[in-house]
């Protein structure tokens, strides 16, 4: 946490969203790694599916590729380390929450 504290970001949990439209890819698509990185690693994620009205309508799995060497240069580069074209594979299915959601 020291690098985050140096730039004024506290140790609280954060919700992170992918911004570039092209960052997410579907099943079977090639996952992209930025050419400026030599050290990337996958991060399994639980992904909420949101409709155009902003309502959570389902969930899927994601494999979010993080550029560790870019992130390590500065906490201010976290966005660049996470937001890259084709850096988040989603699927292969979406569990819709039509009738409510339980863990069973």
Language-model segments: which ranges?
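Active-site microenvironments in enzyme catalytic cores
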Residues: 1-104
